[in-house]
Each structure stands twice: as structure tokens, then as C-alpha cells.
Amino acid sequence: MKISIITSTYNSEKTVKDTLDSILNQTYKDIELLIIDGKSKDNTLEIVRRYEKMFQGKLRYISEPDKGIYDAMNKGIGMATGDVVGILNSDDLYMDNKVLEDIANAFNQNNVDAIYGNLIFVEEHDTNKVVRTWKGSQYYPESFLNGWHPAHPTFYVRREVYEKYGVFDISFNVSADFELMLRFIEKHRISNLYMDRTLIRMRMGGESTGSIGKIITGNKNVLRAFEKNGFKVSVFYPVKRLLPKAIDMIKNKLKFKK
């Protein structure tokens, strides 16, 4: 079973080497890496080209202007030839070198369309320093309406699901990943499995862990995502969504306090 990994880059010279090493060191080798660059102005492409031979024909890249990270992801999905598609951002890392092997085994042993798991948030300049954790759980009907959703960087899905139900709606900006997972899992009820295993180390300060403004915009778009997909949510939904995250952040701050 081939896994297609999509990595979007834009001026990512400070972090992309770590990401490439993380992929290169995986024990599972039936992969392809698709790097979708947004016309970087730094040394990102030079770094990618240095790694090209190391991937022995399994790395392909393009560099052209895009309409943002989700547009880049859509380009990658269009290029993918694997059975399963996953996304690893250019500032993120796999938790260890057996992540893809475990994901492949889970797909092979379970007749499911999608798999997701846990992630840890780490310091931008020290990826061994944990800031907080995101522990997932198994989906059940209407979970999304109660504030649940998978951590998107851990979300691996069969390519045929994208072909059947579509790709990222780039009008949703910072929460297009939420809308896509809502559409796939809650609306179309694709089969899915939660792996109780940490899959990703996600740097703080990235596209979806940044400013308060992005968080506010993201939550507005989440409500629009429900409307687009024909769901009515309770007026208490924002509380259901944000309160557990706030509690989790406080717990993690105490847990990982210096």
C-alpha cells in the first residue's frame, strides 16, 4: 500500500530539512513525497533539490504561486498516486520513525477509509520540548456537533475518498481542514479508526497555532462549515468546542511548566 505524503512549503528554509529527515527516516518505504512550493524566495528549493536523490525517485516537487496552504494541498492531492494520502506540514515532524509503518498496518488490518491519532505541540526552536498534547478519541455519530474533531495533521485518508467527496474548500481559509473532515466523517460517514498513538510533533506558531485573530476567524468559519454541510448546531456549540480546549491548555501548561 503506497502512502502519498503532501508537504506544502513557502519560505520554509528554517524547518523543511527537519521535515524531510523525518520522512526519510521512516521504516516504511512504500511512499511518495509531493512537495508543493508556493514560489519560495529563500533557499527552500535548494534544500529540497539536495534531498531529491536521497528519496530515490520518490520525491516530486513543483514551485508556483498558489492561493494559500489549502490550495497547495489540493494540488498535491491532484498529483498523488498513492492508496492513502497524508499531509505533513513543512514545520512539523513525525513522532518517530515507525509512524508510517503503524499507519500502513492499521489500514491493512482494518477495513476503514481514514485513520487519525494523537499529536504533541512542541517549541518552535526545540522540538523535543513539549508544550501541550492533543489526545484524540474515536468518532461516534454527531461527535462534530459536540465539539469533537480529529487533529488534522494526523488524518490519513484513502485517495478514493477525495475523488468521491472532494478536496479542501479554500474559501474557508484557516479552517478548511475542519470543513473537509466534517464533510467526510460526519456528513458522508466514511469509516474511520482512532489510533491511540502519538503520530505528529507540531511546532507552535504554525499556520493553525498562531494568532488570536486566526482562532477567531477559524471559529467563524467552523460555524459556516456546519451550515454548508446542512448541520444545525446549538447556540452552545462554541462553548462545547472551546471550553475543553481551554481546560486542556491549562492542564498542559501546569504539566509542562518549567
For each feature predicted by the language model, list its residue ranges.
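Catalytic core of nucleotide-sugar-dependent glycosyltransferases
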Residues: R197, M202, G210-F236
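Membrane-proximal basic amphipathic "stem/tether" segments
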Residues: E227-K258
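Nucleotide-sugar donor-binding/catalytic module of glycosyltransferases
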Residues: M1-K214, L254
